[in-house]
UniProtKB/Swiss-Prot annotation:
Homodimer. GO terms for molecular function: holo-[acyl-carrier-protein] synthase activity; magnesium ion binding; transferase activity. One of its GO terms (cellular component) is cytoplasm. It catalyses: apo-[ACP] + CoA = holo-[ACP] + adenosine 3',5'-bisphosphate + H(+). The keyword ATP-binding does not apply. Keywords: Cytoplasm, Fatty acid biosynthesis, Fatty acid metabolism, Lipid biosynthesis, Lipid metabolism, Magnesium, Metal-binding, Transferase. This is Holo-[acyl-carrier-protein] synthase. Its EC number is 2.7.8.7. Pfam families: ACPS. GO terms for biological process: fatty acid biosynthetic process.
Length: 126
């Protein structure tokens, strides 16, 4: 196995809160997959939930070396937790096609948050 990419992102939670206050659920609709959307709608901390998902997806786009463009969208990267609570990534659409093209075999996600920030790192391996 070889490392194909590494991405890190940090999000100021207040910034996400301000966007939600200004534009309602538009950002959440653009960023979240259908499964994440269902969780977000009833989550006890929806702003923090969205900020963490946003950080992971930005980090993933950086790890893939593309950013969010050329057919890639935030909602094609889905963050979920495994049976131990560890954050994982599931890919859809163009993100999945890109992973297959690059020969991605493993994706590692780490996520941390404090009062004001959410931070994520994603490593992709062949």
């Amino acid at each position: 196995m070889a490392i194909l990419g590494l991405g890190t992102d940090i999000v100021e939670i207040a910034r996400i809160e301000a966007v939600i206050a200004r534009s309602g659920d538009r950002l959440a609709r653009r960023v979240l997959s259908d499964n994440e959307w269902a969780i977000w709608k009833t989550h006890h901390q929806p702003v923090r939930f969205l900020a963490k998902r946003f950080a992971v997806k930005e980090a993933a786009a950086k790890a893939f070396g593309t950013g969010i463009r050329n057919g890639l969208a935030f909602n094609q990267f889905e963050v979920f937790n495994d049976e131990l609570g560890k954050p994982r990534l599931r890919l859809w659409g163009e993100a999945l096609k890109l992973a297959e093209k690059l020969g991605v075999a493993n994706m590692h996600v780490t996520l941390a948050d404090e009062r004001h920030y959410a931070c994520a790192t994603v490593i992709i391996e062949s």
